[in-house]
Design a protein with these regions (language model features):
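Short coil-to-beta strand junction motifs in C2/discoidin
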Residues: 41-48
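Solvent-exposed serine/threonine-rich low-complexity stretches and specific carbohydrate-binding patches
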Residues: 7-10, 61-71
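N-terminal "first-domain core" detector
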Residues: 1-41
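Exposed aromatic-hydrophobic patches
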Residues: 19-23, 73-83
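C-terminal interaction-tip segments
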Residues: 1-3, 10-11, 27, 98-127
Length: 127
């Protein structure tokens, strides 16, 4: 089973973006994106979006996919169908954090995002 981390596990304290990732053989495929949240403070949320580009320089004006806001540790998966977007060669993760605690502390999340072709787990189990 081939897994591509779009964002390796990281601790983040501010909004940010991950590196540009070349989709390679996964261009134009149906992908399962998994967001793993391993660390979180109370009273904060994390929003993760996936952006696409044909060349790694010029990025779409809207995200290709968006995870709903998350408030707890766990694994969350969504589908990214690139079947109609064969022009997308690169993807990049962006994240936004918010905190509504009365404390002055900054938000903090430990998280990662990886992508695998839909059906990859089934193929491995059958083999």
């Amino acid at each position: 089973m081939l897994r591509n981390f779009l964002l390796p596990e990281s601790i983040a304290r501010a909004d940010g973006a991950g590196p540009e990732i070349d989709l390679g053989s996964k261009r134009g495929k149906l992908l399962v994106l998994t967001l793993g949240i391993t660390r979180i403070l109370e009273q904060e949320s994390l929003e993760v979006t996936v952006w696409g580009s044909p060349d790694g320089e010029k990025w779409d004006s809207k995200p290709l996919a968006k995870f709903p806001p998350k408030f707890y540790c766990g694994l969350y998966s969504i589908l990214l169908n690139l079947g109609s977007r064969s022009d997308v060669r690169f993807v990049r993760i962006h994240w936004k954090m918010s905190r509504w605690s009365k404390r002055e502390s900054m938000p903090m999340f430990g998280f990662y995002v990886y992508a695998e072709e839909s059906g990859a787990r089934v193929s491995v189990a059958v083999a």
